[in-house]
């Protein structure tokens, strides 16, 4: 059975990560918290996923629209993806106060808008992918990421709720 045939185990992993974040003290009591927690989870899981692609556990044909032509190109794309997801995760941790770095509100808002646009474009790319797995699994993930970033861009800097 393939990795994707074990959707129940994948779902259990997502639930486990969600419980892990709750155990760390994140309480979901507002849309802001849902957005922050959702983005932290998505970026963390995305980093893990792309590491699994690099080491060969996840088949490479289900990423990058199935268009990576060779191992070198795939590695470059995966490194870019891991780097961007790490930067996004650090940025969200800064916004949430987990990392004590001051960031100007205007810069934060611009970055959130850019992330929203990037995830919308990525959603379109996923819809055009050759792989049905990429369409079915990653289209909702990138769409949700864009919604969370858009919400934070519109509301996060004006209130804490």
Regions found by a protein language model. Give the residues of each.
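Core segments of alpha-helical transmembrane spans in multipass integral membrane proteins
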Residues: 45, 52-54, 71-97, 113-117
């Amino acid at each position: 059975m393939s990795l994707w045939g074990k959707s129940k185990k994948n779902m259990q992993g997502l639930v486990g990560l969600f419980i892990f974040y709750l155990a760390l003290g994140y309480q979901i009591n507002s849309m802001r918290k849902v957005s922050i927690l959702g983005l932290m989870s998505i970026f963390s899981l995305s980093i893990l996923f792309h590491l699994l692609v690099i080491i060969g556990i996840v088949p490479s044909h289900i990423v990058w629209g199935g268009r990576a032509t060779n191992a070198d190109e795939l590695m470059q794309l995966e490194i870019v993806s891991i780097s961007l997801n790490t930067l996004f995760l650090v940025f969200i941790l800064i916004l949430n106060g987990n990392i004590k770095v001051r960031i100007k509100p205007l810069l934060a808002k611009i970055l959130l808008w850019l992330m929203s646009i990037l995830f919308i474009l990525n959603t379109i790319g996923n819809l055009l992918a050759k792989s049905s797995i990429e369409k079915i699994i990653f289209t909702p993930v990138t769409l949700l990421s864009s919604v969370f970033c858009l919400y934070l861009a519109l509301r996060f800097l004006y209130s804490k709720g």
